[in-house]
Amino acid sequence: MKPKLHFTAPYHWINDPNGLIYYKGNYHIFYQHFPYDNKWGTMHWGHAITKDFVNFEHLPIALYPSKDFDRNGCFSGSAIEIDGQLYLYYTAIKYAKENPSNVHNQYSDDDLRASQALVVSSDGIHFDNVKNKKQIIPMIQEAYLGDYRHTRDPKVWKKQDGKYAMVIGSKVAYENDYCGKALFYESEDGIHFEYKNSYQEPTIGNMWECPDVFKINDQYLELSEIDDD
């Protein structure tokens, strides 16, 4: 049985909500979705709209693997409106080695390759996964900056100065373990991003996922899901 109040996918697997935004008269809910089974697999972005958070209209899948850089999944991200268009930012996943027993799961943790990507839609309903995808931040190469396998979940917002900021969750080696880290980027147009700064805290988890940033009074608050595995 499906719950009556809690949002669910129309079928099969659902996890992280992504890209929650009010756009052109509707609240849009995107979410991590594997449309072929009731277990985690190659991630797509499911999509629904609502006006009251009680009645939902399910729409066609918004994002699905279609490029070499995201051939093994479209992981979590965020949405923002820029000049009337809807920008979806997500983590593109590619496996260095395919799993011969199940192509929908990585062979090992070391085989993940993560980069950041973008799709733009003019109506928030139709997303051209073939022509309109861009890899905007390639896989990290510098180990001191972040983990090339686990740098993900871009959150983008517009700053007061008109520029666009992005925060991405990651981790770096620390002593005999890992330390969670947030990477900060900046852009003039929401497409071309430049690395600006980072923050890490060894006492709070060994991986930070799904980061977000809020301004409260004169201070900024960074929130993340903490992975201690």
Where are these regions (language model features)?
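Beta-rich carbohydrate-recognition and catalytic domains
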Residues: M1-D153, W157-E209, K215-D229
